[in-house]
Design a protein with these regions (language model features):
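A short mixed-secondary-structure module that forms the rim of ligand-binding clefts
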Residues: 34
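N-terminal intrinsically disordered, cationic/polar leader segments
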Residues: 1-31, 41-107
């Protein structure tokens, strides 16, 4: 199961943690893991490439863990990007609820 925690502050999405492997299929064939990875890595790369917002990211490939947090309140543009990420992850969860779990945590 891939567990996802969306960090919130004052009703804004400010980060996330993805942990675990979905178990949908074996490594290299797991479309659920591939979808989660594509969404999260593209989000981080987009923030890094196109935005000035500062962030901290920690990863552990073995555990399938990515932990991302903005250091300050994100710009409006970055907020749109993270809201889009959450939207995409929630859509994956709807289609693959036995393999993805999303929770929201106030920080």
């Amino acid at each position: 199961m891939t567990n996802i925690t969306i960090y919130k502050s004052n009703d804004l999405n400010i980060g996330f943690k993805v942990f675990g492997h979905s178990g949908y299929d074996e490594a290299g064939k797991d479309i659920v893991c591939a979808g989660v990875s594509a969404l999260t890595i593209n989000f981080i790369n987009s923030i890094e490439e196109f935005m000035d917002d500062r962030f901290v990211v920690t990863t552990n490939e073995e555990d399938g863990m990515i932990d991302f947090k903005f250091e300050t309140e994100p710009s409006k543009e970055s907020q749109v990007l993270i809201d889009s990420l959450v939207f995409g992850l929630e859509n994956l969860e709807q289609d693959y609820k036995d393999f993805i779990s999303i929770e929201f945590q106030e920080v």
